[in-house]
Each structure stands twice: as structure tokens, then as C-alpha cells.
Amino acid sequence: MNLLVLSVILAIIIYLIFKRNYKYSPSKINSKIPGPIGLPIFGNILSLDNKNGIHTTFQKWFKIYGPIYSVNMGNKSAVVLTGFPIIKKAFIDNSEAFAPHYTFESRYKLNKCSDITQENGKNQSALKRIFLSELTVTRIKKQESHIQNEIVKLMKVLDKHSEDGKPFLLNNYFSMFSINIISRFLFGIDFPYQDFEETSDLMVGIRDLLIASGEIVLSDFLPIPHSKRSKLYTSYQALVVQIETLVKSHKYKEDDECMLSKLMIEHDKGNIPWDAVISNCNTIITAGSDSTSSTALFFLIEMMNNPTIQTKVYNDIVVSFEQNQQADDYMNESMVILKYSKYRSLIPYLSLALKENYRKHPAAPFGAPHETTQETVIEGYTIAKGTMIFQNIYATQRSDTFYSQPDEFIPERWNGDENSQTLISFGTGIRDCIGKSLAYNEIFTIIASVLNRYEFINPNPSIPFDDNGIPGLTTQCKNTVVQIKKR
């Protein structure tokens, strides 16, 4: 038995060495690109920091090896690109070669990679057509009424906390806000704020899946079996159970405007399989709710850690509202909602602060990995066909190579032409975040409206809030206990 095990291990080692040194292999072609030296078989996998986030390791290596470097992920060859000029050359100037998302075996076993973020095959064009038809400027503007109504419900809850003056946990309320917006878009339903029991499992499920999705799954890169007890598998299946319940309870009508009905119509036409309906609902509810709530929470943390900036943002909002207010800004006698479609260009300092927040706190630190479809030369380096490609978003936006004082929150850096770099907080290229327009709308409207109504206060001002977050596929905001004062 021991001899058999030893023989298998030896065979695997020989296979991996042959594969890595085969002259046409991605690893061999990419070997001329600088990068960290890895271990036999494992490559650089064991050097990746799962605890603090893989993006922190990518940032460290960028400082050593520069804007283009190679990483050996077990038996897979990867290249990490940093800085907008380099990323643009790959994902915009050579868009077709860098367009597909990388197919992880672990993800394929979960849902056959059938959702919009992973699908590269025949269903991708059908899914993209569905999503783009629901995310036009006109359709998003129609969503504004739902966003306004949701903010009113949130404000009624926040008013009570303002009245009692006690510190409270802010995270769940913003998670509920985001889940309700995306649930209205997806299912045509929302949930009450009074009781978190109905959505607490959903909130936890979304958080657990995003954290697990940001960790390395060894079986994706080494010839070992995939485990159904892995955090990724168990968190995905737990969330799917909840999503399937919501899907089955949906009253399907062909004239429905919710996204689920559109997916069901395409399924009935034979354009997408049922697995794709479920997996896309899962992706929409997960990515759609998290990107908004986490980004908004990080913004409010920056406001409390920088109260002078919060005051400047508030004053800018007040001046703009006094000059531009109309009857339709009032949802009732006292509640004002500052809509994105009307106010996005009328509150300049808020726009600078939001841009700075997108820079400092990108929704996904390295996005979804891509795969090259052909051999391509970028900045003199030949990148092999079949190479896994990372957009190093976090290091791009938190490096002093591109921004002075990158760890500081400085809205003024976006004044004039001092920083002409293009933000890539939601990725870039033809496969960037498809829902970013809706996210921009939600985040602007909720931030402008709540800052106009409340001052957000750190109950322990001598201890600034931790703005690093919990690492994962997206960065989760840590539990944030605040006080608010009605203005």
C-alpha cells in the first residue's frame, strides 16, 4: 500500500515537472516574466496570505517585481497586472485576448460556471443581453423610485436611533437596504426592517460565500480531489437553498419587470438551463447587495474618522439642495431624498469624496481572474495563451507609485488634472462589473440623503474605526457601532 502511494506521488511529481518545463506550456513561456520563486509542485500558493487577503501579497510583490509579474499557482501559470496603463493595454487594447474569465474546477463543480461572471460559452451572450437590457440608463432611472422608498424606510429606523442617542450596530441596516434594492430588482419583493430574522440567514450566507470565494482552493491548482466539506462548497450550497426558496415562491408572469421573470423566459425558450437561472440569481443577490452596502459603510467610516471632511460634504449638500430643491425631492414633509439622476453633478465635493472612497476601498481587490485566449505581448513581455490573469486593483489604487499618500482619505486629490488615472474599482474591459451603473446610483443616493439628515459619530473618537475590512472576494466591512445625531 505504501509503495502504491509512493508511486502515485512520484508519478504526479514527474507529470508536474514535465508539464512545467514543456516548451509550449504557459509556465515555460511565462518564465521570462519576473516574479517570486516558488516551491516545487506548490509554486507560490503557500506564500499567499489568506488571513489578510491575497491582495496584500499581490501588493507586496508589485513593489518588488513591478507592474507585470508572474506567479506559479501550483500547476497553473498566472500573471498579475498593476496600474491602469498596463491593465488598459491588456483589457482594452487587447480586449478579446483577455476577455474570458478563468474557469476554476471548484466553481465548475458548484454551478458549471453558468452565471454571468463565469460563463464563457454559448450562454454568455444570452445572459449579457438579458442583463444589459435590464441595466440601461432608462431602466436604472425607473429603479430610483424603489431606491427612494427604501431610503425612507431606512430613515424611519435611523430616526429612532437618533432619538435615543445610544450607540448601535450600523451594518445590518445597510445590508438590509442593499438586499431590498437588489431583491426588488431580481424578485420584485422586499423585506421589513423591523425584524432581521427573515433575512439574517441571507445576510450571513452572502458574507460567508464572499469570504470563502476569496480564499485559495488547493484542489484548483494541485492534483488532489475536491472536497464537499470545503468552506466554498458548504457556503455556496447553504445560500443556494435560500435562493431556490425565493425562486420557487416567485409568481412568474411574462409581463413582469423583475429580472427573475426575464431569466425564466429565456429558460422557457431553451436559451439557458435551469442551473443558470439559479446561479445567476445567486450571483445577483450576492454581488449586487454586497458591493453597495460595503462601499457605503466604508464611506461612512471615512466620514467618522475624518469629521472635518464629513462637515465639508454636509455643507456642500446643503448649499446644493438650497439652490436646486424642488417638490419631488420631498418624500414627505421632512424626508428629503437626493436622487443620483438629478444631483450627481450638483454636489461637487461629495462627488470627489465618493471617488476617493472608490479608490481607497475597491469593491473587489483583484476582481475575477481572466484567462488569455492567445499569446500576447504586453510591455515587451510575452504572456502565454491559457495564462490566468489578475487585475491588481487594490495595489493599483493603494500604491504611492500612482497616488501620493495612498492610505489617506483625500478627496481633493481628484480636483483638476493632478490625478488623471482612471479608477478601476469595478474592473475594466469588456467583462467589467455589469451592475456598476446601478451601484453608482444606489451609493450616491443613500450617502447624499443620510448625510443630509444625520451626523455620523464615532462613540469612541480616540480610537478610529478599522477601515481594513475582512478579506474575501470582496472586502467586508467589520461590525461598526455608531451614534447618529439628526441635523
Curated annotation (Swiss-Prot):
It is an enzyme of class 1 (oxidoreductase). Its cofactor is heme. Its EC number is 1.14.-.-. It is a single-pass membrane protein. Keywords: Heme, Iron, Membrane, Metal-binding, Monooxygenase, Oxidoreductase, Transmembrane, Transmembrane helix. The chain crosses the membrane at residues 1-18. The keyword Transmembrane applies. InterPro entries: Cyt_P450, Cyt_P450_CS, Cyt_P450_E_grp-I, Cyt_P450_sf. It is found in: Membrane. Heme binds at residue 433. Gene3D superfamilies: Cytochrome P450 (1.10.630.10). One of its GO terms (molecular function) is oxidoreductase activity, acting on paired donors, with incorporation or reduction of molecular oxygen. Its main location: membrane. It holds the Pfam family p450. It comes from the Eukaryota. Coiled coil: none annotated. One of its GO terms (cellular component) is membrane. The keyword Metal-binding applies. PANTHER family: CYTOCHROME P450 513A1-RELATED, HEME-BINDING MONOOXYGENASE FAMILY. Belongs to the cytochrome P450 family. This is Probable cytochrome P450 513B1. It comes from Dictyostelium discoideum. The gene is cyp513B1.
